[in-house]
Amino acid sequence: MNMLAPAAKNAFTPASPDRPAYQSGFGNEFATEALPGALPHGQNSPQQAPYGLYAEQLSGTAFTAPRAHNRRAWLYRIRPAAVHLPFEPIAQDRFHSDFHAVPASPNQLRWDPLPAPAAGTDFIDGIVTFAGNGGPDAQTGCGIHLYAANASMTGRFFYNADGELLIVPQQGRLRLLTELGVLDVEPLEIAVIPRGVRFRVELPDGEARGYLCENFGAIFRLPDLGVIGSNGLANPRDFLTPHAWYEDREGDFELVAKFHGNLWRARIGHSPLDVVAWHGNYAPYKYDLRLFNTIGSISYDHPDPSIFLVLQSVSDTPGVDAIDFVIFPPRWLAMEHSFRPPWFHRNIASEFMGLIQGVYDAKAEGFVPGGASLHNCMTGHGPDAETFEKASHADTTQPHKVEATMAFMFETRGVIRPTRFAAESAQLQARYFECWQGLKKHFDPAKR
């Protein structure tokens, strides 16, 4: 048997930064090569890999994780990932994992969008940490960040050793050039970059802003559907993973790492995006939120928001997630004799919300695209006074379509602690609480 025989022909699909090619499915075992025959046949680590490449395994879970949950990829690259000079710490206080600088607050909090950054701010320099819990030590919890950038990364590359990155663009497209291929992502799409995968970010529109959820814990997965059945919510076929693509580029470059809550830099003499072929199930992917199959009530009452769950990071407690990524997409509301917007609520979980476009149906004003809100554990929240009055008198015999909107939520089991930047930000709306002060007393014991 010739162990270096070419791989199956369907593994070779040419791709380029200008024309990314994708593979469909969530968590699949993919096999892809940018040069024909670059994937070894019948084994992972041959004595001599095709084209003089190096074989390297990238492990996203423990070797002994159950097969259904085991995540790893074999990469065939021009140089191993170990080839760079030593890392040195970067002195900065914007992108980090310190969630204990200021006390967590039981108040309802809301922020306006970040201001435009200074000229020449790339994706990494444009990230600012807003809140989080847990940390990379315990491998649980999340960091919540906002980004605003106006320059592409050219001589810089980045990877995150602390967690996987869920990227939610709000304005401007992103071109994510990764070790395992290229993703073009626009607002109303999301992307997930696995822990450890190196990448750089180009800005096709010249500027971009959005949100990041840094998942320190179990890898994001699709939720079980239970009695919904075998289809619904985010369908696996709509998740797209890139085909192999590489660049063979030498120069004086910088590799930035987020490790143990801090940023580090190392000089590197070549582009680390030099993976010519790969196979496995640990890879970046994107998803179009507009394809979400929304489930709702067609009789009465607004169901729990768990019906809007896109991705989850499970915890060690069955039925309790460490992180939920939830969206509130365009949808028809048909519930009769019911209050149709999301109801008033106090939650054991903590909720960080963002708005990609439009108006959130529980807030008539003040919550704008690019902004954010935080309602922590057992903090009362819900529709503002204007929304309540309008929805309380709406004609519920007729269906109504919520259109041109997309809000989302990072919901966590742990208290979400704002950073000093967020707590002292000029974007913090000091009078957010006033949106509920107009809720009138309607109680009349003589009138049922």
UniProtKB/Swiss-Prot annotation:
Gene3D superfamilies: Jelly Rolls
Stretch list, region Disordered: 1-26
Entry keyword set: Dioxygenase, Iron, Metal-binding, Oxidoreductase, Phenylalanine catabolism, Plasmid, Tyrosine catabolism
GO molecular function annotation: homogentisate 1,2-dioxygenase activity; iron ion binding
EC number(s) reported in the record: 1.13.11.5
UniProt binding sites for homogentisate: 360, 381
Catalytic reaction list: homogentisate + O2 = 4-maleylacetoacetate + H(+)
Swiss-Prot/TrEMBL cofactor(s): Fe cation
Binding site for Fe cation: 345, 351, 381
Gene Ontology CC entries for this record: cytoplasm
An annotated GO BP: tyrosine catabolic process
UniProt enzyme class: oxidoreductase
Keyword Metal-binding: yes
Pathway recorded for this protein: Amino-acid degradation; L-phenylalanine degradation; acetoacetate and fumarate from L-phenylalanine: step 4/6
Active-site residues annotated for this sequence: 302 (proton acceptor)
InterPro entries linked to this entry: HgmA_C, HgmA_N, Homogentis_dOase, Homogentis_dOase_bac, RmlC-like_jellyroll, RmlC_Cupin_sf
Family under the similarity heading: Belongs to the homogentisate dioxygenase family.
Function: Involved in the catabolism of homogentisate (2,5-dihydroxyphenylacetate or 2,5-OH-PhAc), a central intermediate in the degradation of phenylalanine and tyrosine. Catalyzes the oxidative ring cleavage of the aromatic ring of homogentisate to yield maleylacetoacetate.
Oligomeric form and interacting partners: Hexamer; dimer of trimers.
Name the record gives this protein: Homogentisate 1,2-dioxygenase
Gene name tied to this protein: hmgA
